[in-house]
């Protein structure tokens, strides 16, 4: 009896720690690979425990998606079968909005009824959240906030990762071909890169879910800057590259400066990862103050320029136009008129 309880307890701890340590995974469902998000978590809203099970289930809707009966059908299906994994909702995947479900159903159900099918009960819209009353996603709600000058990159297999069977193309990739550029921790770098988050973290694990998808799980200790809330727990940093830059290893204590994109924390080539030092963290705070000061200066100059242009209207450029000379015909008429009015005396 005691042994069975101990085994059950160990199994529960293993599952609990496993879920906490690897909350997100790359989307591998073919229908959903071009969605605005590329990481998901299982189980999904239809209780599929793995993406392999979800792939088998979602295939039944491929023909319906191909006929393009609704502009939001693919989005809705992927939000159900491969829900987006975000920092704020690691334990409860976000559901699609009720309005998205209703649009997809109303658009496609007439076509389904022509073939004696109705909208499936598993995709019922009634239990889904309304946009202004709960948390949900819709195509209109997803925006891109990654700076345009940041290179979008893919991920490499040359790291300590959670193993999955590698594709043939993945095995051909060699770590030796990757040359990472060193990003120096200076004020000039900080001002030019304009990072959206700065954290002190410990690297917990690096997990691969394909040759072009790597998730670095870090334990956040301190938050110095963020554009959206970052929980002080284990969070995923997403890289999408054939080369792992900057290169990091598990168990390192580091300061990370990088970008947030679609509510996800990224780990990209121009990001800065340095061994943790108190002095460097103090510098980063000073650099952020300089960045904000620089922004205020630019805004003040724009306001001053706007007030000046309103109070002093622009003067016309160039010399004023010269008066046009009278035409020869008018001069002739004028002289003839003068002759008639003033005849010569004999």
Curated annotation (Swiss-Prot):
UniProt-listed GO biological process terms: bone morphogenesis; canonical Wnt signaling pathway; cell differentiation; negative regulation of canonical Wnt signaling pathway; negative regulation of cell population proliferation; negative regulation of non-canonical Wnt signaling pathway; negative regulation of sodium-dependent phosphate transport; negative regulation of transcription by RNA polymerase II
Pfam families from the UniProt entry: Fz, NTR
Region (Disordered): 292-346
Biased composition annotated in UniProt, kind: Basic residues: 330-346
Signal peptide range in chain numbering: 1-18
Residue span(s) of domain FZ: 19-139
Database matches in PANTHER family: FRIZZLED, SECRETED FRIZZLED-RELATED PROTEIN 4
Domain-level remarks: The FZ domain is involved in binding with Wnt ligands.
Protein name per UniProt: Secreted frizzled-related protein 4
Organism: Homo sapiens (Human)
Annotated gene: SFRP4
């Amino acid at each position: 009896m005691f042994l069975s309880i101990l085994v059950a307890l160990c199994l529960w701890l293993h599952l609990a720690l496993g879920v906490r340590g690897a909350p997100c995974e790359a989307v591998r469902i073919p229908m959903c690979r071009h969605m605005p998000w590329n990481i998901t978590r299982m189980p999904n809203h239809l209780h599929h425990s793995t993406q392999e099970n979800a792939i088998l289930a979602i295939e039944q809707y491929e023909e319906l998606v191909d006929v393009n009966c609704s502009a939001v059908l693919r989005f809705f299906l992927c939000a159900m079968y491969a829900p987006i994994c975000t920092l704020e909702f690691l334990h409860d995947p976000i559901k699609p909005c009720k309005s998205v479900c209703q649009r997809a159903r109303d658009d496609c159900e007439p076509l389904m009824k022509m073939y004696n099918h109705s909208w499936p009960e598993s995709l019922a819209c009634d239990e889904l959240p309304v946009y202004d009353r709960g948390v949900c996603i819709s195509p209109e709600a997803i925006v891109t906030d990654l700076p345009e000058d940041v290179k979008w990159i893919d991920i490499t297999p040359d790291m300590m990762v959670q193993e999955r069977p590698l594709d043939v193309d993945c095995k051909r990739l060699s770590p030796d071909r990757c040359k990472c550029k060193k990003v120096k921790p200076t004020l000039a770098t900080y001002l030019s890169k304009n990072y959206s988050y700065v954290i002190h973290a410990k690297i917990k694990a690096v997990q691969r879910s394909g040759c072009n998808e790597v998730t670095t799980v870090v334990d956040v200790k301190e938050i110095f800057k963020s554009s959206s809330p970052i929980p002080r727990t284990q969070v995923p940093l997403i890289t999408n590259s054939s080369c792992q830059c900057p290169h990091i290893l598990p168990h390192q204590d580091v300061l990370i400066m990088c970008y947030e994109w679609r509510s996800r924390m990224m780990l990209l080539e121009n990001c800065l990862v340095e061994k943790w030092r108190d002095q460097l963290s103090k510098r980063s705070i000073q650099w952020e103050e300089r960045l904000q000061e620089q922004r205020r200066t630019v805004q003040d100059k724009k306001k001053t320029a706007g007030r000046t242009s309103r109070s002093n209207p622009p003067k016309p450029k160039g010399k004023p136009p010269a008066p046009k000379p009278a035409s020869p015909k008018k001069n002739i008429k004028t002289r003839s008129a003068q002759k008639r009015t003033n005849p010569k005396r004999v």
